[in-house]
Design a protein with these regions (language model features):
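A glycine- and Lys/Arg-enriched "phosphate-lid" helix/loop adjacent to the NTP-binding pocket
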Residues: 390-471
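Hydrophobic positions on the alpha1 helix immediately C-terminal to the Walker A/P-loop
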Residues: 293
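NTP-dependent small-molecule kinase module
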Residues: 224-253, 444-513
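Short beta-strand-centered segment that lines the nucleotide-binding/catalytic pocket of NTP-utilizing
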Residues: 303-320
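ATP-dependent small-molecule kinase phosphotransfer cores
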Residues: 315-412
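Conserved NTP-donor binding/palm subdomain of two-metal-ion nucleotidyltransferases/polymerases, i.e.
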Residues: 2-56, 62-278
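P-loop (Walker A) phosphate-binding loop of NTP-binding proteins
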Residues: 284-285
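Conserved lysine of the Walker
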Residues: 290
Length: 513
């Protein structure tokens, strides 16, 4: 029987959403309630409060008959659909994300139109039990949830099927105490006999004894052998619910495991916006916060999505330029007048005189920068979000842009140097354009003060900050949208503004592909 003390605490029908529930989640759940779309938060309700506060995914099961109306509400609530970058999705399931502007973080909606579950990686089983989960009058924190009996029966079924392969055993073993804790809460809230009856309806040729055996094994962290036995028994009973053949499941499981390792090594996520990614360029004077804010934006979006952070001002060398660029530092020591900073001085720029070494360096830099930006554009076209520190403008002489104007070219005699200058100009023509430029503004005095606090090899250099000011602020980007953010505000306020502008450029897909 239900524990009368635990049940009201876990299934309080009168509770409302947490006060600090982020606005997109609040809009979504209130719209679903108003439209009377059948839905429930169908699993892991022990952590529902954390989900409603945006700390966990929100796992909603929705009546498939309301699919079209649900998609409309999802988008009206500010969510944008995402898909797996490596074909690791599941049928009848989709992901969507919205920006919590107050917290500068992404919220994750994990929506189901059908119950596909079982193992953690492939979710190889399809159980037609949606009605048993949706037909409930129970609520928790203002959100519909299954009855305690349905949630207990489903939890035991899910956990048993997670003990049927070596990979699954390794995954479920991590933090297994949380499984035991959740089971204890569910047992206290549910009528075990009613849960066993549901289990017997869902699992062919089973009985209450099988349910109780599985429940006891799952509740004992030391009973690994019993859990494996229970899992294999359950798997044999529900093989008719497999959505894939046994061999296909094994192959797919290890394919996905390999991709998980690959993404972990690259420190990337598998999800991408369904309607394509974007290249978001951060530009501005030195010490305006480009690297700091770019890193924060990458971590904010990269917690859930495939996000790349690249430094266009310092592109990696390509095969063609690797050896000559490796010799540049030595050449600068031998010829101090060839340092980049020397050519940034107003009098040197006004002279229009450039050495062959400098022209060669600028041409190689243009070549490497173009190669990097083409890779960025390709990644964005495939759905990745690319955040760049700096970006070439259309203004000759601006930082990270073409250094040689037509006057300099005309003043140079025909030969290798002029040919390289022409190549440099050509490399900057027709570059892939960013989807959005965010120009970070700061006063010269504050930029100098910030530079003094930075730990750098050559130490603070106020003259360099002021010298580069014009070069870093005069760039024009043609028809590309440019948003300006004043970074004199606190870091937290700047991150909020940056995340809002960056998220706005991601296009929302109307429905899953």
């Amino acid at each position: 029987m239900r524990d009368n003390e635990t049940y009201p605490k876990t299934m309080d029908r009168d509770a409302n959403l947490p006060v600090d529930c982020p606005q997109p989640f609040r809009l979504l759940l209130e719209a679903l309630k108003e439209s009377r779309i059948r839905h429930c938060h169908w699993k892991s309700n022990i952590r529902l409060e954390e989900s409603l506060r945006g700390k966990e995914d929100l796992d909603l099961l929705v009546d498939r008959a309301e699919e079209e109306a649900f998609y409309q509400i999802v988008q009206q609530s500010g969510f944008k659909l995402a898909q797996s970058a490596s074909n690791c999705g599941h049928p009848g399931v989709f992901h969507a994300f919205a920006l919590d502007e107050a917290g500068a973080r992404l919220l994750h909606l994990h929506a189901y139109f059908q119950v596909v579950t079982g193992d953690s990686v492939v979710k190889a089983y399809r159980f037609p039990i949606e009605a048993d989960l949706l037909d409930s009058n129970c609520q928790k924190l203002g959100v519909p949830v299954p009855t305690p009996e349905a949630e207990l029966a489903l939890f035991v079924l899910r956990m048993a099927l997670k003990h049927t392969s070596v990979l699954e055993l390794a995954l479920v073993a991590r933090g297994y105490q949380s499984v035991v804790d959740e089971l204890m809460v569910l047992q206290a809230a549910a009528d075990r006999d009613a849960a066993a009856a549901l289990w017997c309806r869902w699992v062919p040729d089973s009985n209450p004894e099988m349910f109780n055996d599985a429940l006891r094994a799952i509740g004992d962290p030391r009973a690994l052998g019993q859990r494996i036995t229970a899992g294999l028994r359950v798997a044999s009973r529900v093989r008719g619910n497999r959505r894939m053949g046994a061999l296909a499941v094994i192959v797919e499981r290890w394919r996905r495991a390999g991709l998980m390792v690959h993404h972990r090594l690259l420190d990337r996520r598998n999800a991408r916006p369904m309607d394509g990614g974007a290249v978001i360029a951060l530009v501005g004077p030195k010490a305006s916060g480009k690297s700091t804010l770019g890193g924060r934006l990458t971590r904010t979006f990269g917690r859930h999505l495939d996000v790349r952070h690249v430094h266009v001002g310092k592109p990696p060398a390509t095969l063609l330029t690797m050896l000559p660029r490796a010799a540049i530092p030595l050449a600068r020591k031998v010829f101090p007048g060839e340092r980049s900073g020397e050519y940034e001085k107003p009098e040197r720029r006004a002279s229009g005189s450039y050495s062959l070494l400098h022209v060669l360096n600028m041409t190689m830099l243009a070549y490497d920068r173009r190669a990097l930006l083409k890779r960025c554009a390709a990644a964005a076209a495939s759905g990745a979000i690319v955040v760049t520190d700096r970006y070439p403008s259309k203004t000759v002489g601006a930082i990270d842009s073409s250094r040689f104007d037509d006057a300099s070219l005309s003043a140079c005699r025909p030969g290798l140097k002029r040919w390289l200058m022409e190549r440099e100009q050509a490399l900057y023509r027709g570059l892939p354009e960013p989807d959005l430029v965010i120009r970070l503004n700061v006063t010269p005095a504050l930029a100098v003060a910030r530079d003094e606090q930075r730990v750098k090899e050559d130490g603070p250099d106020a003259s360099a900050v002021l010298r580069r000011w014009e070069m870093e602020t005069l760039g024009s980007f043609g028809d590309v949208p440019v948003v300006e953010i004043d970074t004199r505000a606190s870091l937290g306020e700047s991150v909020v503004l940056l995340a809002k502008e960056a998220w706005a450029v991601i296009r929302p897909a109307m429905t899953p592909a």
